[in-house]
């Protein structure tokens, strides 16, 4: 999403090629982006995030996601492949929903077993 807002790569054009009903954003991802917008004091970024939140579904992080998060986090820790709490939550969310995660951070997310990832950059 951050690349689409910045106009980097092919992200924005790939997003608009999909109907909004086929897309969603994790509430965790939205929170991470809101944090960045506040750190930058960027009203422009907040307006872009408002538009995204009105256009696509914002998926809530629920109890099933929390259970998946615990399982994935423990497995990654056992293997010494920790990717950070936020990325683990995002991965758990995608797995719980059974969706493909769109990311440019394949280095981290490829460590999560069974997670489908695609890079639209």
Each predicted region: which residue ranges?
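Active-site neighborhoods of divalent-metal-dependent phosphate/nucleic-acid chemistry enzymes
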Residues: 57-104
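Short, well-structured N-terminal submotif of metal-dependent ribonuclease cores
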Residues: 1-25, 35-56, 78, 107
């Amino acid at each position: 999403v951050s690349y689409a807002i910045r106009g980097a790569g092919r992200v924005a054009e790939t997003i608009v090629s999909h109907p909004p009903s086929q897309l969603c954003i994790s509430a965790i991802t939205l929170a991470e982006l809101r944090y960045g917008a506040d750190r930058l004091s960027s009203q422009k970024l907040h307006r872009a995030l408002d538009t995204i939140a009105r256009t696509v579904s914002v998926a809530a992080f629920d109890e099933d996601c929390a259970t998946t998060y615990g399982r994935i986090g423990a497995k990654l820790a056992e293997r010494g492949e920790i990717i950070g709490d936020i990325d683990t939550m995002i991965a758990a969310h995608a797995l719980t929903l059974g969706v493909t995660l769109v990311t440019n951070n394949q280095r981290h997310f490829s460590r999560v077993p069974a997670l489908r990832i695609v890079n639209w950059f």
